């Protein structure tokens, strides 16, 4: 039974990822004692700008930038030991204390070399029909988890069990690689030797994360649950099959961190003031003209992990409405408002025409979304700069009107507005922890 009152917040991307979650988690981390990753892997990067210096985190929660904050990698994450240790070394080289403040769930599924081999071979075989995976083994690792053949972090410390499980799973994957995908097999000895070499460095950070989070809640500590990707990439609720391999909605924080759902009191939905998407998949409000190019250029829309250019389009309020419902969004944070500065007019998606009928929420499935024609509403733009503004009243009148219309279309209040990449370039209307 929880003895003291804590407040816990889930931060969720409401679009197709890349909404600016890293900056907001970093900013909110000043109000918490723990930050938790609960799904995904090292396929998505969170970009932070601290005092003008760029930092990209792929696995480690963004709270690591704050002294006194403990960071947790929950059981819902698929973990590449090699990628994690490399990221730790990069942060330590920058002067951060990481290992004493990072805990890794002992029951995380491992990403191993054969997952990467399968991922890359599949994409190569699909050619133009590819989904656009990052090729880091995320999907195949989740497949092993669901098929109950995965190796987990705790297996690294039982070599005999590791060998037994590896032989079984590699027999399966090598058959797929050689007989179906036409690729080279993966050596069991190489996989084992690499994993065993990395295990000692990982061992001091391995914990029962679920139990430790429960203790923090009993002590009244505030926790922040950091989502990766975005709700429209959710394996169930996204534009399937152009989705990621995990559940990235707010409800996944409970299962992916091992906490009860009653512990999640507030859900902050992060959304850009426009819309972007990486890779393949339908995108109703996409702009393939000079305005789309302008948004990409000013917004620096390139993937933080892959470097791939992002497709850009107008804000899609009907897609966001789907995310609001899926996640139980308490309040929105609008990021990159400044990218819209200087546009004479701005379009805002309010729904779709599907087979001649108006729909005010994103349909399910890629085929249905591909047939949806965006219904756009035109609003006046603004010429004044919004960069670095920290008071809502100082925003241009038309910028405020735009934000108010976004909130109206989506049916949820705006609590935060980001006007630049630095953590201090933030307008606070209601603080998720203090409001």
UniProtKB/Swiss-Prot annotation:
Residues annotated as binding GTP: 17-23, 45-47, 310, 336-338, 418-420
Keywords from the named record: Cytoplasm, GTP-binding, Ligase, Magnesium, Metal-binding, Nucleotide-binding, Purine biosynthesis
The keyword Zinc-finger belongs to this UniProt entry's keyword annotation: no
SUPFAM superfamilies xrefs: P-loop containing nucleoside triphosphate hydrolases
GO molecular function annotation: adenylosuccinate synthase activity; GTP binding; magnesium ion binding
KW Nucleotide-binding (keyword) present: yes
Catalytic activity: IMP + L-aspartate + GTP = N(6)-(1,2-dicarboxyethyl)-AMP + GDP + phosphate + 2 H(+)
GO cellular component: cytoplasm
Main subcellular localisation: cytoplasm
Matches recorded under Pfam families: Adenylsucc_synt
Protein name as annotated: Adenylosuccinate synthetase
Protein's organism: Bordetella parapertussis (strain 12822 / ATCC BAA-587 / NCTC 13253)
Gene (name only): purA
